[in-house]
A protein has these predicted regions:
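Conserved H-loop
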Residues: 165-170
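Conserved hydrophobic alpha-helix in the ABC-type ATPase nucleotide-binding domain
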Residues: 145-150
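N-terminal low-complexity, Ser/Thr- and acidic-residue-enriched intrinsically disordered segments
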Residues: 1-4
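Extended helical coiled-coil dimerization/tether regions that scaffold
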Residues: 9-111, 118-128, 152
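Conserved D-loop beta-strand region of ABC ATPase nucleotide-binding domains
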Residues: 162
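Walker B catalytic acidic pair
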Residues: 132-134
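Conserved D-loop-proximal element of ABC-family nucleotide-binding domains
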Residues: 136-140, 144
Length: 170
């Protein structure tokens, strides 16, 4: 398969740039969803290291809010029965009455929500974000409030929706 063009500022470009400096993880992350999860956790680790080295012994500085923090807040608002857990360098999901599990085991709709939230947070400043079929994989009852919440995460960006759903477009 011939190589494809990687757009500057895309998730794949950010992933490739990070991987140039990473010698301790696999270079093969097959999907953009996997790459987003990797970028979220990598930013979290970088912030933890930075916090550790900038905090004076016995002192305290405020820990900065990460993209993962913002994803988690919106995720748990959209899915109040699901919790996002960080354990031993991994991101896990726990539903009511279940053991924690890998986000790759989420339903298609849950993966879509996680992807949309995280993807928007990694968009370049003042980006125009084109969303084709914003209703894809989403239950109609959460669609409008979800996209309103996602837009509120990035007030600097312009969102353009391509949809056949007249209720959503109204």
């Amino acid at each position: 398969m011939p190589p494809h063009e990687v757009w500057p500022g895309s998730i794949e470009a950010m992933y490739q740039e990070f991987m140039e400096y990473s010698y301790y993880v696999s270079k093969d992350t097959p999907t953009e969803f996997d790459q987003l999860l990797f970028l979220l956790l990598s930013e979290e680790c970088r912030n933890l290291f930075e916090y550790k080295f900038k905090t004076p012994k016995g002192g305290h500085i405020d820990f900065p809010e990460t993209r993962l923090d913002r994803v988690q807040k919106l995720w748990e608002r959209v899915f109040p029965r699901n919790k996002m857990l960080r354990a031993e360098g991994r991101l896990l999901i726990q539903s009511e009455n279940s053991e924690p599990f890998n986000p790759l085991r989420l339903s298609s709709g849950e993966k879509a929500v996680l992807y949309y939230i995280a993807g928007v947070l990694f968009a370049m400043p003042n980006a125009v974000i084109l969303v084709e079929d914003p209703e894809f994989y989403l239950h109609h009852s959460i669609m409008k409030s979800l996209w309103d919440s996602i837009e509120n995460l990035r007030k600097d960006c312009t969102f353009v929706y391509l949809t056949h759903d007249l209720d959503f477009a109204a």
